[in-house]
């Protein structure tokens, strides 16, 4: 409005001017001439997750939060007033540009590079996940993706979110352990070992003999 007043644009033409400027900026973004900085999510918050004491605000299209995370949706009416530990933007589109940087990790499943704002992650094994742009401190991540078209793509978004969360958890003093866990005498008991060792079989035996509730059959987060 200040610019319009400075250039003496009539009030009736200001709306059209705003549309023209927005279209021009979108063209610059599309050609990679400019980009939107991490930390400015588009749209409204679709929900808040609370996992291991960490608050995650999720922005994206309606219904974008994977069903695997439904149990962690916060029911706290005041959660929206808190500053989240992680802001997660789920962008259902291809990235407008590709960021290059120093290569840190490359294998058949994952490529990680550093760049000026943090890290770029690419998952060659997840066809509908284009890229993840993440801040260096893990406080913000934008996941570029498309909706799953095949059965094997249904879990891809959840699998892409997991390393982003685990990176933040590590910075908060927690670590993940490949293990099966159960609840016994008001404490969590973890059984860890290589795949195929019988962790799930062991917890199933406890369930059968002592009716102990399962906590997790694959990955457990450990911290203070």
What would you call each of these model-derived segments?
Residues 1-3, 28:
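Short alpha-helical segments in extracytoplasmic peptidoglycan/chitin-binding modules
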Residues 3-18:
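Short helix-coil junctions and helix-kink-helix linkers
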Residues 10-14, 150, 196:
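Short strand->helix junction
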Residues 16-27:
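C-terminal structural segments of small proteins and small subunits
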Residues 22, 30-189, 195, 205-215, ...:
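A noncatalytic interaction/capping subdomain that flanks phosphate/NTP-handling catalytic cores
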Residues 199:
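Conserved lysine of the Walker
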Residues 202:
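Hydrophobic positions on the alpha1 helix immediately C-terminal to the Walker A/P-loop
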